[in-house]
UniProtKB/Swiss-Prot annotation:
Residues 7-41, 80-115 form the EF-hand domain. The lineage of its organism: Eukaryota, Metazoa, Ecdysozoa, Arthropoda, Hexapoda. Coiled coil: none annotated. It holds the Pfam family EF-hand_7. The keyword Repeat applies. Gene3D superfamilies: EF-hand (1.10.238.10). This is Myosin light chain alkali. GO terms for cellular component: muscle myosin complex. The gene is Mlc1.
Length: 155
């Protein structure tokens, strides 16, 4: 694929190998996780458009199908960036000091937009979250930095 540099192709192949099953490819239900492991932030609608499924074992995606999907998703403009996420979380920053209630972040992740489940939120917090202070507040900018620098892969 001419528009994907060799180093990126190696990363794509590595993620594909880790997430796939011996020679069969990756399950289409894991397409979003594979793309996120490659530092992309596709929406659920985009994942579905690219061939992702909601049920396991409906479809397998082979490497020769995955690379063009990766390339296309990489070009998509509707991906959140650091500044977008910070602006969103500022809405919960009542003191305007870079902190928000951990419970509010948890509620937002569980209930709003493309929501996560309890297990995914626990994994996300374990990998990216500083401990909350005595008042239940967390610094949200460090959370977003960690989240975007080291993608979390859900089992």
């Amino acid at each position: 694929m001419a528009d994907v540099p060799k180093r990126e192709i190696e990363n794509v192949e590595f993620v594909f190998e880790v997430m796939g099953s011996a020679g069969e490819g990756i399950d289409a239900v894991d397409l979003g996780d594979a793309l996120r492991a490659l530092n992309l932030n596709p929406t659920l609608a985009l994942i579905e458009k690219m061939g992702g499924t909601k049920k396991r074992n409906e479809k397998k995606i082979k490497m020769d199908e995955f690379l063009p999907i990766y390339s296309q998703v990489k070009k998509e403009k509707e991906q959140g960036c650091y500044e977008d996420f910070i602006e969103c979380l500022k809405l919960y920053d009542k003191e305007e000091n870079g902190t928000m209630m951990l419970a509010e972040l948890q509620h937002a992740l569980l209930a709003l937009g493309e929501s996560l489940d309890d297990e995914q939120v626990e994994t996300l917090f374990a990998d990216c979250m500083d401990p909350e202070d005595d008042e239940g507040l967390i610094p949200y900018s460090q959370f977003i930095q960690r989240l975007m620098s080291d993608p979390v892969v859900f089992d």
